[in-house]
Amino acid sequence: LHSKDLVNWSIISAAVPAALPPVTTPERPEHGNRVWAPSIRHHNGEFYIFWGDPDQGIFMVKSSRAEGPWSKPVLVKEIKGIIDTCPIWDEDGKVYLAHAYAGSRAGLKSVIAICELSADATQVIGPSRIIFDGHEHHGTCEGPKLYKRNGYYYVFLPAGGVATGWQVVLRSRNIYGPYENRTVLAQGNSPVNGPHQGGWVDTPTGEDWFMHFQDVGAYGRVVHLQPMKWIDDWPVIGTDKDGDGCGEPVLTYRKPDVGKTYPVCTPQESDEFDGYTLSPQWQWHANINDKWAYYAGDRSMVRLYSYPVPDNYKSLWDVPNLLLQKTPSDNFTATMKLTFRPNPKYKGERTGLVVMGMDYAGLILENTEQGTVLSQIACRKADRGGTEKTNDSVAVKDSTLYLRVKFSADGSKVKGTDDLLVRCNFSYSLDGKKFRPLGETFQAREGKWIGAKVGTFCTRPAIRTNDGCLLYTSPSPRDRTRSR
């Protein structure tokens, strides 16, 4: 994502556009694995992104331009359990890396450590030293971001849990401590639960701001921008009404003063498929396979080839060739135009519009013995092996249809949680004008450490042949409203 004012953002590139190394399971999604809490930094004319893979180790990519191309991932250290990595280049030329530990892999969590890197930041050259133990007062501390200001080293970190926690700042005159600590941001009386995993940004005009996320369930991690100032070399974030040094999040505030005014823009959403590559908002469900799709920009379409479902397939949770994107707003409508041309020799080829998460639902076209059938399906607990249930279906003769899902949220919460209650209603049309509802209202659910996504797919049973069905897709512009 790129912005010149911290408010208007667009997607400009993917630092790892294809496959994450080492490619151990290229034909199956790895839910909740691989890239955990990356950090991006700029040093000596180059951008660096570091991340921890809890099963593989510490990785880094770099580029002279944020738009790319980015280097191939470098394995900085092969190790299991290190996550949430963030580098700093010190004035004496030394390079350090702050990180946390994943309890599920390392057998230890709620501590923050620092290690030294080589001058080119391509390898770890010293042992990790624990510089903060949060077990007593700041359990589940993670996501450190490392800075230096006025002779102090600062570590910004969240603690207390993703949806329920707070922001802590450590400071010390020595990189390895001892560190003082202070809680600098908590929910307080605001509706922003668990302000989590934030970073400090200073502007060319001398202002300080803090970006963090809020976990709201099916809509994923929503980014917030908070005002920040320094008092006695401690950051004060949000609004500190009682003057105790711990602020609470604001919902509205003036824009940052960056010296100029920039046009309003939002991350890309709609797509007419008029290019020869996918627009940057699209994400495959697993490492990319070039045989999944053909991009025909001159015809404003993308053609998805039916691809065999994996061995031991239970649901779309197991399918790699889902083409998805994140939800753009609280309330919006997504419409997709597609043409389904199944191979008449094979039954069971499927395509459609899907809302994907640990529970999922969608409008599914399937080639059956009785012809093409459009069904509204839902799958509960897909992450635990759940299977699909058909709520309603109708026979269709037209090969081209418009499929639609309307997302609605009124601020209500899922019982017993801070998650927004998100309702999805499905409909279809033969002409793109008159839409007919189909099936039942679906309550969207998040994925593994991500929000729900919306998109399409094209599959067939495990028939090994190069003669599958074709799917032509071209979505119409999406109607959307923002309540956030």
Question: Where are the regions a protein language model picked out?
Answer:
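Conserved small/polar residues in nucleotide/adenosyl-binding loops
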Residues: 472-481
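Blade-edge beta-strand/turn elements of extracellular beta-propeller
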Residues: 9-26, 62-79, 118-139, 170-190, ...
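Carbohydrate-binding surfaces in secreted/extracellular proteins
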Residues: 273, 336, 403-438
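Flexible glycan-contacting loops in extracellular carbohydrate-active proteins
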Residues: 435-465
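Short, aromatic/His-centered strand-loop micro-motif at the edge of beta-sheets
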Residues: 381-402
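Extracellular glycan-recognition surfaces and repeat-rich motifs
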Residues: 280-305
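Secretory/extracellular carbohydrate-interaction modules
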Residues: 312-372
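Hydrophobic core segments of beta-strands in well-ordered, beta-rich domains
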Residues: 1, 30, 35-54, 60, ...
